[in-house]
Each structure stands twice: as structure tokens, then as C-alpha cells.
Amino acid sequence: MAERVDVPFDLAWEACGLVIRYSGNLMASDVLACHERIAADPRFDDLRFAIVDARSVQALTATSAEIELIEAFLQGPAMTNPAISAVFVATEPSVLAALGTYNAISDRAYRITVCDSLTEARAQLGARPAQPRSS
């Protein structure tokens, strides 16, 4: 996978949760870099939910092999913290196609849900509105 200098994602940690905001033209390497950063963060162990906001993504370039590589990476973090619920907010066809490819992996690390809005995502999780983490 190609490497990029700029990172088209933002991480907003909340009490027991995380909102990931992707934007622009996203590559599989960006998604992997995001997951690497999250898994390396000491707050990862307390993470119970992740809302992935991909509404600002213009396009996602990811082959099936790259999605499988991301999934292979996620197996490690899932072993240390299997309690994470993930909900994606996405409408871009290339993002939805990649999520479909991920969901087709039978032994994937995490089960994901796709919603149309942040409100719906929080309702799916039973998560309260953003509460910045104190630390």
C-alpha cells in the first residue's frame, strides 16, 4: 500500500468511545494508519464504541486484498479488546462497497453497522452525545 504524508482522518476521543472522521480521497493505507494509531493509544483498552464518520470522503481506493490486510491487522487489537462496537456513517458508494467487502469476511475481527447520520449511529450504540475524555 502507498504511504501518504498528510492524514485524512481525525480522532476525537470520548468517555469510553471514539469518533473517527475520514475526509477527502481516502486510500487503504490511510485506514490502516488510522487503526494502527488507535490500537497504539493507551485509551484503546477502555474503548467500547467507535463511530466512523465517512460522510466527507470523496472516494475510497481499496482493493479486496488491501481490505483483507486491514482485517488481518485488526485481529490483533480485537484479541486485546473485543468489546468495541463500531458504527459507520457513510453514503459514498466506494466506502459502502469497501464495507460490503469487509462484512463478507466471515471471521472478521469486528461486526459493523452502517447508518446515514451521526444521530442514528449514536442511537444504534446507545451512546450519549459527545463527552470529551478528561485526560
Where do the protein language model's features map onto the residues?
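Amphipathic, Lys/Arg-enriched alpha-helical "gate/interface" segment within cytosolic domains
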Residues: A2-S135
